[in-house]
Structure formats: structure tokens, C-alpha cells
Amino acid sequence: MFTAFLIKYAEIGVKGKNRYLFEDALVKQIKYALKKCDGEYAVRKTDGRIYVDAVSEFDYDETVAALQKVFGISGICPVVYVEDEGFEKLGERVVRYIDEVYPDKNKTFKVAARRARKNYPLNSMEINVEMGGVILDAYPQMHVDVHKPDILLNIEVRDKIYIYSEIIPGPGGMPVGTGGKAMLLLSGGIDSPVAGWMIAKRGVKIDAVYFHAPPYTSERAKQKVVDLARKVAAYTGPIYLHIINFTDIQLYIYDKCPHDELTIIMRRYMMRIAEQIARQTDCIGLVTGESIGQVASQTMQSLVATNEVCELPVYRPLIAFDKMDIVDISEKIDTYETSILPYEDCCTIFVAKHPVTKPNVNIIRRHEQNLSEKIDEMVQTALDTDELVIVQA
């Protein structure tokens, strides 16, 4: 029975004079998401509301699922609407709505009207009273409960009169692209895809970089990362994934540096490379999946040592999350099962038995000097052989 949806948003509604920019961005993201659905849709913005109208045959569940992946949407309301043909016609449509949507009439209800069009002959309270009376006349077994009703029937008087009672949760956040652009360090683990999803939820467009170490990491490990990027891209739109061959750099560091510092020094070079790619692609920050104390390279001292090599800000959305909190989100966004596939990435291959947990930055710098100019040549080679994959859901 539903052929239209009212799109609710939260934070966008409190924006000031630039609110229209966020609304326009949300409309753009909705149109992009619906391209993957069977059917044709008209997306329109009017009177501070966004509406999606199906203009052909469409799959209801598929459409809702697509809209639930659009950041900026807080709620999706399947609506029916009537032209303003008089109060009697509205009452007939409300009764038919109750009949079609709620087969069990042994329920409580409340009518919540909102009159945005001020020339409508009844005010909001009068609409509530009149429509409540119409429903009770049609279904005497129903009862009014203004505090905790089973059915909250919304009636909005705008260009048309919209009727809805269900609000399907959206992902919230802000439309992708309204918060700048950042480079995600994406591995095959649980954390980094979640970090990318979370920063994108705040409106940040993400590209990604993955450090590959053949033959120590397999093609299946690389494909796993591409698959994870595709899962995240279902929410963010296309992700430009940069695949960097890190093998020679890792082996050289392994040969020249103390093994208890391997992880930190390798991590510092990953950050250096990621920052260079970020600058080349107009990203204004880096994003990682680090969480304080989760592993040796994620103590506060280790994060200080990692940050030191970056001029761009490093965003860590998961910094205070427990592991199970991260797992819960990964299951929600459908990355968990892919993340736990048993294909190792370069961070798990070259791991010291007893990694330093409180690295001294001065000592780390001194050991990096032992790498001479050769490491700079390796870094440049890695950048020159960057494999770019455009990942789409």
C-alpha cells in the first residue's frame, strides 16, 4: 500500500543558514543509494522535509534497506498522502489506513497532527480531536492513550496531507561529503572497517590505503580487504583503495632495527606513506582503528610515537571503545564475518615476541637513522607502484 517515504533527519534540522547544503547533500546520497534498487524514484525536498516517491513498481524491503545505509537519515516513514479534498475525505483515508496497516484493532492510539500549512481550516489540536473521533466511531474497540499508545498516528498538513505511524530507524549521522575527506588505514582486521564506518557517519568522505606484503601475505588477504572496503562502501559510496607493496620496507626494517621496536617503526612508516597519499588526494586527515591499550602498538606512549611522524591530524574513532563494542558494530554493518577470515595481513606477519609498550621517541628516531637513505628510496618505490582499486558496493 505504501508508495512513498518521508525521510526524517536529526542534526541537519538544527543547522543554521547553511542547512540547505546538508539537505541537498542528503538528497544526493539518497538518489545514489536508490540507483542500486529496482524501480524508479522521485526524491524531492519541500517545506523542510525530504520525500521519496516510487514512480514505478518497486521492492519495498529493498528500498528500505537501501535508505537505512544513507548517513544523515534518522528515520524512514512509509507514508500515504491525500490531496486536500475536505475533512470528510481525510477521515475516510485515516480509517482505511488503520484498517490496512493494523488488522488487530484491539489497540490504543494517539493522533499527533502537525499543521505546517497555516491556511488549513483546523489547527493541530482540532485535527487531533476530530480524527480521534473518526477512528473511535469506526473502531469502537480501540481506545485513546496519549502517554504510551500502541499506535502513534501522525498527520502532517503540508502541500498534501501525509499520514504515517511507523518510523524505521536510519543510521543517523551526517551526509557523506559534508565533513571533509580523510584517508583510512584499512587492514583485514575487525577494527579499521568500523573506524571507517564511524568517521563516515560524521559526514567524512573516505579513501583507504592497505599495506600488502607478498609473498608473506596472500592474494586472498588482499581480496579480503577489498571485500571489507566494499561492505563499508555500501554506506559511503565508492572508496578509492590504494594498495601499497610494503614487503621490502618491512624486511629492511626487520634487518636493521631492534625487534622489540619493529611494530612501532613499521607503523611510523605506514603513517608516513599514508600521509603522502592523503596529501596527493586532497584528504585532510588520517583515520585508524586504534583503541587505547588493545595491543602493544596502541598504548598511549606508542600512539605518541606514531603521531610524531604526521603533520595531518590522525582521527581514531574507536579510541575508548571496548573490543566487544567494536565487534557489535562490525556485526551490525556486516564486516565481522569477513574480518575474521584466517588470512594474515602485514601487521601480523612481522611481530616481535616481546614488543615495546612504552617506546622512547628519541631512541626510535635514533634507530630510524640506521635505515639511511635507502628506506626513502623504498618508500618512493612503494608510492610509485601504488595499485588503485575503485571499490563500490
Name each region found by the language model.
Residues 233-234, 238-261:
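S-adenosyl-L-methionine
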Residues 189:
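Conserved G/P- and acidic residue-centered "switch" motifs that form tight phosphate/ATP-binding loops
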Residues 48, 244-249, 291-292, 344-352:
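A glycine-rich phosphate-binding loop feature that marks nucleotide/adenosyl-phosphate handling sites
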Residues 1-183, 193-239, 248, 280, ...:
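RNA-binding accessory domains that recognize and position tRNA/RNA substrates
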Residues 184, 208-210, 243, 288, ...:
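Structural beta-sheet core signal
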Residues 337, 341-393:
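The feature marks non-catalytic terminal segments
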Residues 133-135, 172-179, 250-251, 255-333, ...:
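Active-site adenylate/phosphate-handling loop in enzymes that bind or generate adenylated species
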